[in-house]
C-alpha cells in the first residue's frame, strides 16, 4: 500500500479490482475453461474441497476434468492484505459465495476465496491468483 494513498482509496481500488476479477473468473470458468489457468501465477495453489493442486500444468489438467458448470455468485467480499503480511506485494483477499451446477449434478452452494497479487506488466497491472480455496457448502442439521 503506497504511503501517498489513503486507506479508504486503497480499499476502494481493491474492491473494484475484485469485482472485475470475479466477473472474469466465473465467466472464464463457465465458458472458456481452457483459458482459466492464465489467471493463476505459475506456482499458484488451488485447494478444491481439501485436495491440493499446484502449478499450471496440474491446474490445467484439474480444470479440464471438471464437468461444465454454471456459477452464480451471490456474495462478494474483498479487502486488501496489509503489505507487512505480504512483503510489500500488493495483495487482495477475495471471498465469494453462491451456487454452482456442474453438468450431471444437482445445484450446490459454494464458498471460494482467492489471494490475488498485483503483477506489473509493461503498461498496466494484472491481478493473478496466488491461492484459491474452493469448498462446497452444506447446511448443518
Curated annotation (Swiss-Prot):
Keywords: Cytoplasm, mRNA transport, Nucleus, Protein transport, Transport. Residues 17-136 form the NTF2 domain. GO terms for biological process: poly(A)+ mRNA export from nucleus; protein transport. It comes from the Eukaryota. SUPFAM superfamilies: NTF2-like (SSF54427). GO terms for cellular component: cytoplasm; nuclear pore central transport channel; nucleus; perinuclear region of cytoplasm. It is found in: Nucleus; Cytoplasm. InterPro entries: NTF2, NTF2-like_dom_sf, NTF2_dom, Nuclear_transport_factor_2_euk. Pfam families: NTF2. Regulator of protein export for NES-containing proteins. Also plays a role in mRNA nuclear export. Associates with NXF1, NXF2, NXF3 and NXF5. This is NTF2-related export protein 2. The gene is NXT2.
